[in-house]
Amino acid sequence: MAVSTIVPSDYKEQDSTVVLQTAMDLVSNKFHEPVKSTPLVNTVEILEDDSTMVDIPEVIAAPEVTVLPEVITVPEVATIVLPSEEGSSEKIDRSLRLSDVISSVVEPAAGAKKLRKMLLETNELIVCPGVYDGLSARTAMELGFNAMYMTGAGTTASRIGQPDLAIAQLHEMRENAEMIANLDPFGPPLIADMDTGYGGPIMVARTVEQYIRAGVAGAHLEDQVLTKRCGHLSGKKVVSHEEYISRIKAAHAARVRMQSDFVLIARTDALQTLGYDACISRLRAARDEGADVGLLEGFVSKAQAAQAVKDLAPWPLLLNSVENGKSPTITVDEASEMGFRIMIFSFATLAPAYVAIRETLARLKYEGIVGTPKHITPVKLFEVCGLEHSMAVDKNAGGLSFMGGV
């Protein structure tokens, strides 16, 4: 008994084990039966919609999975076989669209793999709006950003109402990052602030491990002292070159132990006190110890930012854009032209949120009305936060809670 397969016209090579396992999982879910598989080459028929029907004849399920080719290409496909009762020759007259399989190959919560793939397979600038809570992250996702950044300043301000002065610690940062990273298991990867790693090498390793388990795609680790402050404040102090590199070593070793694609971003705040050359030296050493990306915080000019990219090429650099901070404002186009690979906007949602909240509350205090725009209804806000998905989950499970709508 075999299941026919329709292959989309734009079907590309896929890892055979991934495609087969995904297909078998889909069939198991559809027919509520365990399945076995075997590869099969057969004829191809072009359908009206330019997809390809692969006609698969009856085959017998083997007790073990046949050895697979390295890749499956059209017309070489996988036959999905359902077990039958002894002596039965009944065929299942249903088809499985391989388009469903291909779309399902994307792995949930594989943010690190997505981010690393973006860095390795494209030369495009990865633009990450700074988000700090569920609504700001949902809004970034609604607008289709390919990646996001969890800002430490925003997390500290929103979760505990404090300034960015090393007050938020690992548990607050990890919990917030985990919530944001898992809003949508198929959503954009999340880069997070990891501050100093919250201690010595042991704590740095623990932080990386917890971030990886939380689904964070990557994080930046800096060289400030433990009593650190926001990178766009004056008076920053940094640890020695040796102590900083020990943090990087610990982070890299933890990532290797976890067998993760977690992207380790080495950040230096030494520009204020030690100068440009010391920053480049620290970043080169971090690169040599396993860091994937560099971040020189607090550029004093656009020319200096462009020079850093040249001095560290071809190693990818991340640019932190904080308007009205210590660095000049650099646009996305300018950063791309300079050769930066990632650009984060730490205050992109935090600062506008404060402005909007303050203006609204002032209107309430002095005019007695909030003045919410007519199109911003409760339903609209809940839709941004996944209302339709939640209703679909209930419906697919046989629930009746939302039959009448909301």
Say what each PLM segment does.
Residues 105-118, 122, 126-319, 325-340, ...:
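Alpha/beta enzyme core
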Residues 46, 61, 81-84, 102-110:
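N-terminal organelle-targeting presequences
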Residues 1-12:
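N-terminal acidic, proline/glycine-rich, low-complexity intrinsically disordered segments
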